[in-house]
UniProtKB/Swiss-Prot annotation:
Function in brief: Catalyzes the conversion of (8S)-3',8-cyclo-7,8-dihydroguanosine 5'-triphosphate to cyclic pyranopterin monophosphate (cPMP).
Key words of the record: Lyase, Molybdenum cofactor biosynthesis
Cited Pfam families: MoaC
Binding, substrate: 75-77, 113-114
Gene3D superfamilies linked to this entry: Molybdopterin cofactor biosynthesis C (MoaC) domain
Species this protein is from: Cupriavidus taiwanensis (strain DSM 17343 / BCRC 17206 / CCUG 44338 / CIP 107171 / LMG 19424 / R1) (Ralstonia taiwanensis (strain LMG 19424))
Chain segments annotated as transmembrane: none
Family: Belongs to the MoaC family.
Gene Ontology biological process terms from the UniProt entry: Mo-molybdopterin cofactor biosynthetic process
Full protein name: Cyclic pyranopterin monophosphate synthase
Length: 159
């Protein structure tokens, strides 16, 4: 198994030195879901929630979060993102909203944490905007779907 890179030989946490790594095109895609009551789902779907356009605000929140990841995750490098795309898939049968965030850069370190942070904040924003009518919403299935670029190459989640 590969050693954890955020610890030195004495076991102390440190930010990994990426200075000698080649700048390459990096891409990451992450996803997650929030499940709610059917009536809450209808408010989200129809854009009629009391606080406004839930999906639109969640999209902006995801983009903002990707850009602030290094401020939230202690050992993440600040990254100049070149692209952030946020998609939502609404599944009426299960009253579930899925969020997919794709992040891109040309740099020396990956953008997986940015994609994952964007997903989490988008889903938390949906929760915040709908909690007045449904405190039982469940956020889950947050995961990295794929990453491309860098020394470790490409990776895709199974299934």
């Amino acid at each position: 198994m590969t050693q954890l890179t955020h610890f030195d030989t004495a076991g102390q946490a440190h930010m990994v030195d990426v200075g000698d790594k080649a700048s390459t095109h990096r891409v990451a895609v992450a996803t997650g879901t929030i499940t709610m009551q059917p009536a809450t789902f209808a408010l989200v779907r129809d854009g009629s929630a009391k606080k406004g356009d839930v999906i639109g605000i969640a999209r902006v929140a995801a983009i903002m979060a990707t850009k602030r990841t290094a401020d939230l995750i202690p050992l993440c490098h600040p990254i100049g993102l070149t692209k952030v795309a946020v998609e939502f898939v609404l599944d009426e049968a299960t009253a579930t909203v899925a969020c997919v965030v794709r992040t891109e850069t040309r740099g020396q370190t990956g953008v997986e944490m940015e994609a994952l942070t964007g997903v989490q904040v988008a889903l938390l924003t949906i929760y915040d905007m709908c909690k007045a009518v449904d405190r039982g919403m469940v956020i889950g299935n947050v995961k990295l779907l794929e990453k491309h670029g860098g020394k470790s190459g490409d990776w895709m989640a199974a299934g």
